[in-house]
Structures are given as C-alpha cells and as structure tokens.
Amino acid sequence: PILGSKLTIEAPEHPSQVRVTYSTSPDASGLQWLEPSMTEGKQLPFMFSQSQQIHARSWVPLQDTPSVRYTYSAHVSSRPDVMVLMSADNDPSAIRDGDYTFKMPQRIPSYLMAIAAGDLVFKRISDRSGVWSEPAMLDKAVKEFEDTERMIATAESLYGPYRWDRYDMLVLPPSFPYGGMENPRLTFLTPTVIVGDKT
C-alpha cells in the first residue's frame, strides 16, 4: 500500500492559506466500510475511520505525525438518509440531509481526526455530553453512560476544565473490530461495553 507521497506546492509568496482538492480511495486503509448486514439495524451501510497510527494519510492529505497538530474544517456530502459525524463540533440537532459542515477549533494530531457515517441518532446526557448510535442501541447506550457528566465533573475537579468542550460517544455497529478510540469530541466505542451495569 502507498503510505504517503510528497505534495509540492510552488507559490511565488508565502500564502496564508492553500486549498488542496483531492479524492480518497474506497480502499484507503484508514476507512472501514460496512454493508448493511454488518450493522445493528441492517438497513443502511456504515463507514468509520481508524486513523491510528499512520492511516490518516490514506484518506486526508496531511503531515501524518503526532508532532504536527492542526485545526480543521470540513464539508461532507453524503446520501441524504445517512448521518455524518466527525471528531469536531457535531450538532446534536443537525438535520439528516446529506450536507454537513464541521469545525474543530482545538489543535489535534492527525491520528485523532475521525469520521463516521450511518444510521445514527443522538440522545442528550447533559449540556455537553450525549450518545450517538444506531436507533436500536440508543436507549441501552444512554442508560449505560448516564453517569458521564458526573465523571467529567469529577475529572475536572482534579485536573481542570475539560479541554475539548464536548464529550460525545459514538457506539459503533457490532462488527466494529476495536475496543474504542478516544477521538476528541467523539469517542468511538464498541457495543460490547454496553452490558447493563454501567461498568
């Protein structure tokens, strides 16, 4: 697999901004594509990223090293029945219409850039935390994580304000092959953590 290639930009002066137009291959190692049969609801396909360790470069043109931290904005178009989320400012009240805009104001390393798309719905836990999941898992997930705000407040009492502003959780389909990934603003979780006893 190609794990990066040089991008040379020749400009007469030092521009403050450069726009790069690119397309990503469906075979990108940092993207996983699930057929509807591999999801909980079995109605819509699902896509998620796993950029850790050096797979962000397979779907986004960037310097894929933890030593480079950046903010980002993104505009994502999808089929209208699919909800798209990123490790950014996901709007819990966003309309599922196939047109999504994101902004990540805090600097992150490349392996924490994340995207997911599928039959996703949201339920609020607190003003700054909630759960995204397929509809069939939502109530169970919210019950499992209903103490999240108390945990955030306890951590803040020990270590100071939570730096990402929101802590939302995304419960992925049963075929998600990882335990989870602590992406800023949108932690990816395996559904196997939902056992009914809040552990």
Task: Map each language-model feature to its residues.
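Hydrophobic helix-coil surface modules that form long, contiguous segments used
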Residues: 50-54, 62-199
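Core domains of carbohydrate- and sulfate-ester-processing enzymes
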Residues: 25, 29-66, 112
